[in-house]
Amino acid sequence: MFNIDEIYTISNFLFLCNKTIEDKIPTCWLQGEISNLTRPESGHWYFSLKDSKAQVYCVLFRFNQRHIKFNPKNGMEVLVHVTPTLYKARGNFQLIIQHLEPVGIGNLNLAFEQLKNKLVNEGLFDNIHKKPLPNIINTIGVISSSTGAVIQDIIKVLNNRYPFSDILLFDSMVQGQGSVKKLTNALNAADQSGKCDVIIIARGGGSLEDLWAFNEETLARAIFKASTPIISAIGHETDTTISDFVCDICAPTPSAAAMLVTPDRLELLANTDKLYMRLHQSYQQTLHDYQSVLNQLKLRIPISNKQIAFFSQKLDHVSINLNNHVKSTLVLNNAKLNSIFSALKQHSPIEAIKHIKILNQVSFAQLKHQIKQIININNSALYLANEKLKKAIATLTDKHKTTLSIQANSLHHLSPLNTLSRGFSITTNAKNQILSSITDIKINQAITTQLADGKLYSNIKKIEKN
C-alpha cells in the first residue's frame, strides 16, 4: 500500500494511515476511566479513557447515544465498544465509541469516597474544630503556583478592596507528581512562620485528576493540624475536594477567598466619614454646652469676676515687688562680700576671715528674716483677699436668691391657677378662646370650664343677661 519512493501529501499520508488502522485493527471492547468529559452544543461527547499507565482520546457521536440510559461523568469506570481511527484534520489517533456502559464507580471517585468516610469518622470535618477568622487581618499567606492566574486574581482583588494587606506567597506545584509533598511543605512553612493571620490554599479549576493533590490524606491532615485559620479556594464552585471539607472556611473561588479576608476599602472610608461626623457633632455640642454654662456663670457673678481679676493683679504686683526686693538685697550683700574679699586679699589675716564669716552669717540671717516677713505679709494679704472674695460671692448669691424668691412669689400670685384655687374658674369655647361675655357664646355650643382641680365640659342650654 505504501511506496517508499513516493512523496505523499499530508492528507494522502494520513488517509493511508487511517485506512491501514481500520483494515488491520478490528472493533474491540475496552475498559477504562472517563476523564476530561466535555459536551458542546453539537451534542457529541468528547472525553479521555484511561488506566493507570495511559489514556486515549474518545468521541461518542450524538447518533450513537440513543441506547445510553445513564449520564456519564468524570471518574466513572466504563466498558466501551470502539472503532480505532485517525482524525485526519489534526492527525490525532482516537476511538469512535459505538457502545458505552458503566462498570462501577471509578477508581479515583472510589478513593475519594473512602478517604472522605474515614476522615468523617475521625471527626476531622466537625464544626467544633473550625477556627474563626481573626477580626484584624494584616498578613495573608497564599499557597499556590507563582506562575498561575490564581495568584494574580487574588492580588487584584486585594489591591482593589484593601491594598494595605501584606501578601506572602508560598510557591508550590498544584498538580502532578510530587505536588502533594510540595503543597504540604508550603502549608507547614506558612503556618510555622508565625507571620500569617490567615492562609489561603488556592488553584484554578480542572478535572478530577488535576485536582487530585487536594484529595490526598497527607494534605488533609496538615490542614487539620495547622494553628492558622485555613481557607480552601480550589477550582470552580462545582468542584469539591477533601481539602474543602477539612479546612476552616471553604470559598467557592480564589477571588471569593480574597474577598472573605479583606474589608471593602470604600465601605471603610464611608464608615470613617460617619464616625468623624459623629465625633465632630459631639465635640461641637459639648463645646456649646460648656459655653452656655460659662455664659450663665458670667451673668450670675459679674462683680466677683472683677474682684478676682483685681486680686489676681494685686498678687502679681506683690510677687514682682518681692522678687525685686530679693534681687536688690542679694546684689547689696554681694557688693559687701566683694568689698570684704578685696580687703581680705590685701590684708589676709585669719581674724578678718572670721569677721567676714560672722558678717556673712548676720547678713544671711537678716535676708532670711526679711524674706520671711515679706512672704508672711503677702500670705496675709492673699488670705484676706480670698476671704473677702468668698464673702462677696456669698452675698451676691444670697441677693440673687432673695430676688428670685420674690419674683417667684409675684408670679405665683399673678398665676391664673392661683386664682382658680380661690374658687374662681376660666371658661373657654371650642376654639380654646376665653369667654368674657355672654355675647361670645350661643345656644348649644360647647364650653370648657377650668377649675383648680380639673375641667368641666358643658353645652349651653340657656343664656340670661344681668
Curated annotation (Swiss-Prot):
GO cellular-component term (any): cytoplasm
Keyword presence, Lipid metabolism: no
Keyword list, A-Z: Cytoplasm, Exonuclease, Hydrolase, Nuclease
Catalytic EC class: hydrolase
GO molecular function, one term: exodeoxyribonuclease VII activity
GO terms of biological process kind: DNA catabolic process
Domain of life the protein comes from: Bacteria
Known EC number: 3.1.11.6
InterPro entries: Exonuc_VII_L (IPR003753), Exonuc_VII_lsu_C (IPR020579), OB-fold_nuc-bd_dom (IPR025824)
Function: Bidirectionally degrades single-stranded DNA into large acid-insoluble oligonucleotides, which are then degraded further into small acid-soluble oligonucleotides.
Family the UniProt entry places it in: Belongs to the XseA family.
Subunit structure, interactors included: Heterooligomer composed of large and small subunits.
Protein name, entry field: Exodeoxyribonuclease 7 large subunit
